[in-house]
Structure formats: C-alpha cells, structure tokens
C-alpha cells in the first residue's frame, strides 16, 4: 500500500494551491462532550467545485506530466469525484470523460457538463460501469484517475 511522504504532500500542495480554496476547520463543544474527544471538521464542501474530492482530483490532474495531457483524463463516478475531476481538467485545459450511471442525480450530471466534462452513461452496476469505462479508455486513451485509490491524488493536502 502506498503511503504518501511529507515531501509528497508538500509537492501536492504546490500543485493544487492555485486551484483550491483554503477551507475552514470548525469545532463543536457539544459534539466534543458527546464523544469525549476533541473533534475537528474540515469544510471541504466549501471547495470551488462544491465537493470534498477537489484536492485529490486537482493533485492528480496537475501532477500529470505534460506528455500525458493530450488525451485527457477519465474516471467513473456517481458524483463528487466526477465534479472534482471535470473541474480540475477544465482548469488545466484538458479533456475529461466520466462514466456515470444513468441513475446519477441530474444536478451532478449538469455540474460535470458545466465544468466541461463529457459524460458517458452506463447501467447502475459495477459490471456495466467497468465495461463502459474500459470502452472509453480504449476509445480515448485517457489517463485513468481512480475515484479513491489514486497514488498521486492521495498525497493531497
């Protein structure tokens, strides 16, 4: 399993800082008293894309070398990662293709399209998602940015 180093995190911060908001960290005395612990809530829903996956997707996109940009990026996602990746790809000026189940919320689809992403719909099953995604990558040659298991994306700060 890949565990990002401190240097990986510093490099990630440099890649993404022009493209993300510095979001607040909130606390709650009430919840602290209920749990017996000091809790901190990082408000990533305040990101420019409006969703919490903006840092990882931005780091993945802005961490790609220039020779990998022509064909763009692709992923499969029902929502948050799709929005974040299409936002980051748009900022970098590269194509983004997202495989989404046809049952994904219309608001998420509209946001992906609004950021310049191209949606390829599939049936709402893992097998359909994987088969459709394989077709997209074969057709486009795009770089796969995994929705949760991307080595570059995980080093975000």
Residue spans for each PLM region:
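PLP-dependent amino-acid enzyme catalytic core
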Residues: 1-156
């Amino acid at each position: 399993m890949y565990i990002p180093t401190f240097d990986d995190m510093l490099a990630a911060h440099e890649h993404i800082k022009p493209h993300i908001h510095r979001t607040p960290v909130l606390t709650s005395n009430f919840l602290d008293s209920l749990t017996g612990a000091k809790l901190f809530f990082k408000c990533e829903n305040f990101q420019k894309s409006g969703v919490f996956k903006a840092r990882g997707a931005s780091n993945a996109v802005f961490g790609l070398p220039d020779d990998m940009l022509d064909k763009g990026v692709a992923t499969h996602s029902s929502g948050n990662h799709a929005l974040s990746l299409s936002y980051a790809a748009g900022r970098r000026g590269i194509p983004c293709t997202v495989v989404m189940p046809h049952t994904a919320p219309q608001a998420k689809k509209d946001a992906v399209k609004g950021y310049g992403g191209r949606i390829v719909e599939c049936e709402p099953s893992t097998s359909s998602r994987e088969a459709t995604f394989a077709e997209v990558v074969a057709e486009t040659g795009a770089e796969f940015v995994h929705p949760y298991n991307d080595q570059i994306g995980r080093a975000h700060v």
